[in-house]
Amino acid sequence: MGEIIKGKPVADKISEDLIQEIEGLKGKGIQPKLAIVRVGANSSDLAYEKGALGRSKKVGVETEVHELPEDITQDDFIKELKKLNEDKAVNGILIFRPLPEQLDESVIKYVIAPEKDIDCLSPINVGKMTEGDKTGFPPCTPTAVVEILKFYGVELQGKDCAIIGASMVVGKPAALLLLNENATISVCHIFTKDSAKIASQADVVVVGVGVPRLVKENWIANGAVVIDVGINVDKEGNMCGDVDFDGVKDKVSMITPVPGGVGSVTTSILAKHVVKACKQQNNL
């Protein structure tokens, strides 16, 4: 059986480093602060919020939650966002997405201050990620994927990586971040002719499509490393990933579990990005 690579040790190491970094900032009279913007009370937003607040508290990042009504108008939403842009005490802004249909993300993404946009909504941060500019903020989840691979000593340079899923949340940014590590990337999506064949030739497979147990044993090469970003609930009510864990676990060299894999690292990356934003805003 392959090694089950859990997220907790990765998250704990990031948290340890952040605690020391934040102590140093506090010694200079600087307090990192995160503002969470949530429209309505979607259960998955609330679950992520709980994790983000817990992780922030653990490392010493201050937080404030702005819960806005489900039917808020675009003008009112933009007013609230601009207030946070201008609030010098706030270093990072996280907007839960997708937003309700009356709010136009294609407009809002140009409103958020890029220097506070810690989860890559702004096109400026998308551009920085594309260039490999380290001053930007790539999305937290694909950043967590790369952190896990590095933590467990997975060599990426020159390796073949298959990304299953091409969303702006996971697939596309994961492809760019792994490309920046000098891996060779194949991205599979709904129109890909034979995703299983492409995946089965890869050294590293990253899956983020939101389909329970889509990736079966025949998709995975012997000794491959598999990172499962999916979080689903199956027909029996059990939480599972996008990979058929039981079917592939004896074939892989490493695999992340669901739950207990990527998700726990994502909130640590969020806190890390708040601290990075805080330091950049204070020219440190």
UniProtKB/Swiss-Prot annotation:
GO cellular-component term (any): cytosol
Catalytic activity: (6R)-5,10-methylene-5,6,7,8-tetrahydrofolate + NADP(+) = (6R)-5,10-methenyltetrahydrofolate + NADPH; (6R)-5,10-methenyltetrahydrofolate + H2O = (6R)-10-formyltetrahydrofolate + H(+)
Keyword Amino-acid biosynthesis tagged: yes
UniProt GO molecular function: methenyltetrahydrofolate cyclohydrolase activity; methylenetetrahydrofolate dehydrogenase (NADP+) activity
InterPro entries assigned to the protein according to its UniProt record, in alphabetical order: Aminoacid_DH-like_N_sf, NAD(P)-bd_dom_sf, THF_DH/CycHdrlase, THF_DH/CycHdrlase_cat_dom, THF_DH/CycHdrlase_NAD-bd_dom
Pathway participation: One-carbon metabolism; tetrahydrofolate interconversion
Annotated NADP(+) binding sites: 165-167, 190, 231
EC number per UniProt: 1.5.1.5, 3.5.4.9
Protein keywords: Amino-acid biosynthesis, Histidine biosynthesis, Hydrolase, Methionine biosynthesis, Multifunctional enzyme, NADP, One-carbon metabolism, Oxidoreductase, Purine biosynthesis
Keyword NADP: yes
GO BP annotations listed: L-histidine biosynthetic process; methionine biosynthetic process; purine nucleotide biosynthetic process; tetrahydrofolate interconversion
SUPFAM superfamilies in UniProt: Aminoacid dehydrogenase-like, N-terminal domain, NAD(P)-binding Rossmann-fold domains
Highest rank taxon of the organism: Bacteria
Subunit structure: Homodimer.
Role this protein plays: Catalyzes the oxidation of 5,10-methylenetetrahydrofolate to 5,10-methenyltetrahydrofolate and then the hydrolysis of 5,10-methenyltetrahydrofolate to 10-formyltetrahydrofolate.
UniProt cross-references to HAMAP family, sorted A to Z: THF_DHG_CYH
Family recorded in the similarity comment: Belongs to the tetrahydrofolate dehydrogenase/cyclohydrolase family.
Record's protein name: Bifunctional protein FolD
Biological source species: Alkaliphilus metalliredigens (strain QYMF)
